[in-house]
Design a protein with these regions (language model features):
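Active-site-flanking structural segment that lines cofactor/substrate pockets
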Residues: 1-3
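Conserved SAM/AdoMet-binding glycine-rich loop
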Residues: 6-92, 99-100, 106
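Active-site-proximal loop/turn and secondary-structure-junction residues that shape catalytic pockets
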Residues: 18-22, 51-53, 77-81, 115-121, ...
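Structural recognition of alpha->loop->beta junctions
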Residues: 36-42, 129-144, 216-230
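Short, hinge-like loop/turn segments at secondary-structure boundaries
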Residues: 63-65, 92, 130-132, 160-163, ...
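Glycine-rich tight-turn/loop motif centered on a GG-T
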Residues: 83-94, 159-168
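Conserved C-terminal portion of the radical SAM core fold
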Residues: 95-155, 172-195
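Auxiliary Fe-S-binding modules of radical SAM enzymes
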Residues: 141, 149-240
Length: 240
């Protein structure tokens, strides 16, 4: 209601963001998605989920929805390094992410992918290579996140016991790394997010104290300073 008053005529995408939003019986999912689409001024859906939490039946249904309205399925890929995925107990492999993305693309559904930079055991080179590999898949949207240590999680306990296992990036280091990623990925992928922000009361580290819009402004400036642009060094096959 607040945004409806502030932005007259604004249309919206209903974002099923938290948790795995395809992990339920099809009829329950159908009810939730249709309920969202019945809301005034909602013109589409963004559905976040895991690569191992989608079935063919669910994808077939979403494909039908995508012929009626805008739909994007976002997969939490997080890393292309299977050893890192095992370390953080993701419960899926990169091959499973590839398969889910391809099955989704075959149905004509728009696809987004999420990557986390700074997971335990992942090197800078591995993260950069992983971003390129993910963008070589038939995705349209990429969202990037820095690793954040959040209170009350298993990773927070591990961090407090063994901080040496973690390589948390400073703001400047992360900024320059994102510039490197932008230069190497497919030029037609939409970058919709560069950083994430956990509430201050839950965040253990890193504490940058910067807003998303501030990061974007500094990123644009750093790209100009370094003479970089998206896809400048891209040599991949793309959308295979």
């Amino acid at each position: 209601a607040f945004f409806a008053r502030k932005y007259i005529g604004q249309k919206y995408l209903a974002y099923f963001q938290a948790y795995s939003n395809t992990y339920a019986p099809l009829e329950e999912l159908r009810q939730k998605y249709e309920e969202a689409l019945d809301c005034p001024d909602v013109v589409g859906l963004v559905i976040a989920t895991r690569p191992d939490a989608v079935t063919d039946d669910v994808l077939d249904y979403i494909a039908g929805l995508s012929r009626r309205c805008y739909v994007c399925v976002e997969y939490g890929v997080e890393s292309a390094n299977d050893e890192v995925l095992r370390t953080v107990n993701r419960g899926h492999t990169f091959a499973e992410a590839e398969e889910a993305i391809r099955k989704t693309a075959e149905r004509g559904i728009r696809i987004g992918a999420h990557l986390i930079f700074g997971l335990p055991g992942e090197s800078r080179e591995s993260m950069l290579e992983g971003a390129v590999r993910v963008c070589d898949l038939p995705i349209q949207v990429l969202k990037l996140h820095q690793l954040q240590i959040v209170r009350g999680t298993a990773m927070a306990e591990q961090y407090l016991r063994h901080p040496e296992v973690f390589r948390l990036y400073s703001y400047e280091e992360y900024l320059d790394f994102v510039v490197d990623v932008i230069g190497h990925i497919r030029p037609d992928v939409y970058l919709e997010r560069f950083v994430n922000q956990s509430p201050e009361e839950y965040l253990i580290a890193p504490k940058w104290g910067i807003k998303n819009y501030e990061f974007v402004a500094k990123l644009e400036k750093r790209l100009r300073e370094r003479g970089e642009w998206q896809g400048r060094w891209y040599r991949g096959k793309g959308k295979k």
